[in-house]
Amino acid sequence: MRVLGIETSCDETGIAVYDDQAGLLANQLYSQVKLHADYGGVVPELASRDHVRKTVPLIQAALKEANLTAADIDGVAYTAGPGLVGALLVGATIGRALAFAWGVPAVPVHHMEGHLLAPMLEDNPPAFPFVALLVSGGHTQLISVTGIGQYQLLGESVDDAAGEAFDKTAKLLGLDYPGGPMLSKMAQQGAAGRFTFPRPMTDRPGLDFSFSGLKTFAANTIRSNGNDDQTRADIARAFEDAVVDTLAIKCKRALEQTGFKRLVMAGGVSANRTLRTKMAEMLHKRGGEVFYARPEFCTDNGAMIAYAGLVRLQSGANPELSVSVRPRWPLAELSAV
């Protein structure tokens, strides 16, 4: 079975073709980073308009890359939420229309289920059960995963997501949008221990997160210590260490609570090298294993949507006959496979 995946939930247009026998046949991605850079963040209307311009040409490019025609596609998967409503509607409308024209089923995919399943695209995919850390600009969640669609929320951020905190702190440090990856690069030049940031909510029981206070702490630290290059690098290092330590502490608790030996990291922040190293060390000490996707599949992409849609279609998911999206969509509401 070959599935065309369409991802348009935010500021990246991702198109891919996944085959249940041959694996990933095509992967096309267009990023709107330059479009939104002058505004310091994603402008929803601009994002939607750009998806309108880019989605169909990228679908054509993906089919060409895979050396396929429309007749070779057996199903269409599109991101139906969560995300920006206008951006979601572009992908959903195009996906549903193509499926109708091609006479194949269309299936709506949960964006975060796509991220959660992205490590399944690798040569060494995780087996169930596992704890999943979904960590991105919009979400920071710990999920108990016992099967496809069998998700139990263990904890989540009560304010800013980790990726959002990275971007906001990067802006305080004078870095351009999107600043998270640049903050991590700057942190590599920072001295460990010059500044010590708090590890929020680690001094109390539970698995929830809070990252908004770290941004305030960073602002106060910058104000009190100047803004020369080395100081900025040292602050970036202290901030990143605090976020990584906090995530590791909570993941360890989640593994202890569930008794699972496997941890899956997904979402844009899961590409962070410091985070990967920290989690690998923690899992090694526990006799467990950590899994994550290659960096290009940590951020938004069509491959994860194509794969998640394939799994849903093969399990007998009812094809969608209408176009509907859900800007807010709890992961726990998904049906089990």
Curated annotation (Swiss-Prot):
The UniProt record lists the keyword Metal-binding: yes
Cofactor(s) essential for the protein: Fe(2+)
UniProt entry tagged with the keyword Cytoplasm: yes
Primary location group: cytoplasm
Residues at which substrate binds: L134, V135, S136, G137, G138, D167, G180, N272
GO molecular function: iron ion binding; N(6)-L-threonylcarbamoyladenine synthase activity
Location in or out of the cell: Cytoplasm
Listed EC numbers: 2.3.1.234
GO cellular component: cytoplasm
Keywords tagged on the record: Acyltransferase, Cytoplasm, Iron, Metal-binding, Transferase, tRNA processing
Function, as annotated: Required for the formation of a threonylcarbamoyl group on adenosine at position 37 (t(6)A37) in tRNAs that read codons beginning with adenine. Is involved in the transfer of the threonylcarbamoyl moiety of threonylcarbamoyl-AMP (TC-AMP) to the N6 group of A37, together with TsaE and TsaB. TsaD likely plays a direct catalytic role in this reaction.
Name of the molecule in the record: tRNA N6-adenosine threonylcarbamoyltransferase
Lineage of the species this protein comes from: Bacteria, Pseudomonadati, Pseudomonadota, Gammaproteobacteria, Enterobacterales
